[in-house]
């Protein structure tokens, strides 16, 4: 059997700097550890609610706390990391070091699904830290285009790690010995698709462009799109976006009228920015509304939320045209 390139071998061929490679290696190790914890959840008694809420006012699962602590510990011990911010924590944490990188992460995306054994994941973003001085919250408020690397791990039938550093997107599968093996050397999202992912139960609350787009998809061959579409919805961003990375599609978590003063649901720094970098580098588009690129958004606060429309480029354009 052919031996597949491992993560270290792939990183050695990447033109990115050694320090960012070190950070990626540490995060990959933490994700491998999280994979084991997630897989043994019911056996180890780590499923279920933790009996508290996070900064997002969401009920925390036990695994939210466990996975958050795994990543925090790994990153604090990583020399090039000057600071970190987690979806689960109200404030940033610093390491006492200057220069290097800042890391933002969602330790367990889709954790509401964990008790029913649906795929969940970890999402992360690596940003440049200021050259001197201990980082402050303001240093994390960088547009997504300033990310030096981003990635996610998805814990499903296989555990996969999808990364972008200097260019392109690559996917790795965790083998039985705990090594990340390169299984998807050039992830590319096709421009056209016949699948959409959206929570249809909120249809009555959407803005007109989103309604028109989905109505066109639902009309199938007899409608304006002239082809049939399938709907997919896991309610785990990492799982839905991973499917799109592997075979195309469009993922939509749009603004809706239930809370009109809130711009969206997904977190810009922990979810939308890293996923947008991956999607764009794989040939797709990632926007707020079909028009405005998420990577161009200037963050104004640590836990800022945004609407998301991303995936196959021509489908995202169709939303804008609606």
Curated annotation (Swiss-Prot):
One of its GO terms (cellular component) is cytosol. The keyword Hydrolase applies. It comes from the Bacteria. It is found in: Cytoplasm. Pathway: Carbohydrate biosynthesis; gluconeogenesis. Keywords: Carbohydrate metabolism, Cytoplasm, Hydrolase, Magnesium, Metal-binding. InterPro entries: FBPase_C_dom, FBPase_class-1, FBPase_N, FBPtase, Fructose_bisphosphatase_AS. The keyword Magnesium applies. It catalyses: beta-D-fructose 1,6-bisphosphate + H2O = beta-D-fructose 6-phosphate + phosphate. Belongs to the FBPase class 1 family. Homotetramer. This is Fructose-1,6-bisphosphatase class 1.
